[in-house]
């Protein structure tokens, strides 16, 4: 895989092949697990997706909303079901509508089976209105490609200049909403553990790009430790940097 060569030029061919083999196994498992989630009970999800929720629950106890910055980390679909079961917050899942209406409805059904709610990325302001009086945890897949490379923060990410969306940080700073990072660790086949880390308690006191920089560093560390757990096959590097897109931030 060309992405692995770019990200890990210091690894041998055999080492990259080993990562690719584990990645494809996880990719296949992810597909099978999504099918299972169509009918899985809450007790099944609770058994297969675990973690210490004390960090987000403390934010809830303080009477605050929070923002969760995730990544394309297996198995994010199980997280959509596991987080609402364990979190005191109402979990709002920001999602990109799928072109096929049939598939879109299927994934909407899966992702909301345990109490989470969906907010379309195409109209977040309207989508969040029904929940304005709730203490919510807003889940954002923050390593998503931006809609346009000009509207992004650019970082050197695994040997390639890479754009990151601005919205996750700007929304948190505007509302002074505590930011939490998280990752999913595969304990064994079909079993995952979520690990939280407080990214920023008071975003309004930070400078623009500070939170995104922390997130990029967090994501980089995670991928280096668990390279087989990240979705290498998605087109993360489809944009090439140009001077008019702005400065490189690391």
Residue ranges, per PLM feature:
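Short acidic/polar alpha-helix capping motifs at helix-coil junctions
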Residues: 19-20, 42-46, 71-74, 90-93, ...
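Surface-exposed charge patches
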Residues: 2, 81, 109, 170, ...
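Membrane-anchoring hydrophobic helices of lipid-metabolizing enzymes
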Residues: 1-70, 104-109, 115
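Generic secondary-structure boundary/loop-capping signal
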Residues: 34, 41, 46-47, 73, ...
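Catalytic core of membrane glycerolipid acyltransferases/transacylases, capturing the structured
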Residues: 62-122, 147-160
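Non-catalytic C-terminal accessory region of glycerolipid acyltransferases
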Residues: 14-21, 58-61, 85-86, 122-250
């Amino acid at each position: 895989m060309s992405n692995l060569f770019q990200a890990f030029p210091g690894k041998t061919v055999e080492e990259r092949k080993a990562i690719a083999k584990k990645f494809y196994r996880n990719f296949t498992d992810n597909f099978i697990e999504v099918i299972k989630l169509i009918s899985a009970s809450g007790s099944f999800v609770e058994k297969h997706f675990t973690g210490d929720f004390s960090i987000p629950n403390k934010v809830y106890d303080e009477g605050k909303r929070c923002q969760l910055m995730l990544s394309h980390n297996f198995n994010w679909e199980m997280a959509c079901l596991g987080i609402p079961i364990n979190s005191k917050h109402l979990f709002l899942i920001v999602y990109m509508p799928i072109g096929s209406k049939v598939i879109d409805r299927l994934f909407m059904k899966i992702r909301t089976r345990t109490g989470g709610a969906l907010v379309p990325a195409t109209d977040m302001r309207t989508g969040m209105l029904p929940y304005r009086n709730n203490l919510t945890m807003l889940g954002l897949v923050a390593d998503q490609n931006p809609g346009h490379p000009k509207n992004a923060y650019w970082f050197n990410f695994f040997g390639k200049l890479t754009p990151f969306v601005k919205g996750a940080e700007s929304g948190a700073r505007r509302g002074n909403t505590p930011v939490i990072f998280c990752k999913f660790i595969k304990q064994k086949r079909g079993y995952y553990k979520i690990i939280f880390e407080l990214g920023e308690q008071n975003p309004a006191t930070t400078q623009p790009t500070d939170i995104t920089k922390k997130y990029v560093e967090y994501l980089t560390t995670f991928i280096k430790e668990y390279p087989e757990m990240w979705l290498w096959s998605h087109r993360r590097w489809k944009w090439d940097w140009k001077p008019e897109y702005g400065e490189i931030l690391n």
